[in-house]
Amino acid sequence: MTITPATHAISINPATGEQLSVLPWAGADDIENALQLAAAGFRDWRETNIDYRAEKLRDIGKALRARSEEMAQMITREMGKPINQARAEVAKSANLCDWYAEHGPAMLKAEPTLVENQQAVIEYRPLGTILAIMPWNFPLWQVMRGAVPIILAGNGYLLKHAPNVMGCAQLIAQVFKDAGIPQGVYGWLNADNDGVSQMIKDSRIAAVTVTGSVRAGAAIGAQAGAALKKCVLELGGSDPFIVLNDADLELAVKAAVAGRYQNTGQVCAAAKRFIIEEGIASAFTERFVAAAAALKMGDPRDEENTLGPMARFDLRDELHHQVEKTLAQGARLLLGGEKMAGAGNYYLPTVLANVTPEMTAFREEMFGPVAAITIAKDAEHALELANNSEFGLSATIFTTDETRARQMAARLECGGVFINGYCASDARVAFGGVKKSGFGRELSHFGLHEFCNIQTVWKDRI
């Protein structure tokens, strides 16, 4: 049999080019079997009590910690994340289980209220099996931050993972099995686009959650909408990182480098468009370029390296094409702009200056280790530039004037604002975007309630 991306998911080590695994796409029988298991699993799971489900979350966290190094090594091998960052992803995911186990049950408690002397109760009921289409850039965290609250709420979770991280998908499934989660409550299968469409249409899928590109999210969202099924979309971002003249320069540069080059720049909610007030622009740019140049790129298994390869060669080629287009449009190259010689999908840390709003690096998401610097005349101009985007995931403001920062935050068109810090996600607070960055929220009680039937029960209303 000829193996091609049309017939199989192919996982390739991005650091070496070595083929890691090959898995055929799920056929109609595989999909039907998965849906049958999911339907049966949900029927039983929804009847379990919340304390039992919370305890199972703790078991998932324990099972994940027991396989922590195995999981981290798999993440690094399949998508090139530097090993220390992969270990941090595993630890964060295990902690998420504990947090929802401790706090989630209270968030799902019935809420009684009086309405004109009549008793009413808001109940949080499960919806059914949720189809989750997840990306490769945080192959564990993205799955866990959806699966954990979804399962706690009494739903089932059916994963379609990115084809280049099938080893991660298999290992995550093993973690849930180790924790005693029934197969039909947590499941996964290697579905292609046609398989995804088939599942969305099926009545045994209650809702869909997607993390991915705008193009993929729009296509899947349209299918979910046609089936009148709820959909949560966490899509791309081109986050502005605003530095005003009164900012703490050293702190801003440190955060800028971390915010742009974490995970080799392959993060949806990450600093991408650096909007710098002109009075501090020269000093910021000089220090930022020096700090980016000092980053160590190489084998992601080496703990000394902070930059690894990009996850796929086609993504590296697309990024390089975006850089070349931006330079042809008049931007100035201050650092990098080249593929690293030798094996692997490495792209050197890159800094572009004199970037203006009509250029590619400003208009499009740069999903890799490329920073685009734009000069703002003043704070008002910085806000205008920041909002001049089809994306609205998150934003950063660096200034020592907290009052002004909060005033600016209120006018930024995005789902999250970071004042004197860089983008992060945490179980305790909501995460999501606006505009073409998607809709719906993950994490906190908002993420827990997204996939609940919020049911009002009236008593003795005549």
Regions found by a protein language model. Name each.
Residues 6-9, 271, 393:
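Short loop/turn microsegments at loop-to-beta-strand junctions
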Residues 16-22, 205, 242, 296-297, ...:
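Conserved C-terminal structural/oligomerization subdomain of aldehyde/semialdehyde dehydrogenase
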Residues 17, 53, 75, 97, ...:
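Residue-level signal for inorganic ion chemistry
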Residues 19-26, 41-47, 132, 241-244, ...:
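Short, well-ordered beta-strand elements within core beta-sheets of diverse protein domains
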Residues 42, 46, 61-68, 72, ...:
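Structural signal for hydrophobic packing residues in well-ordered secondary-structure cores
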Residues 109-251, 376:
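Rossmann-like NAD(P) dinucleotide-binding subdomain of oxidoreductase/dehydrogenase enzymes
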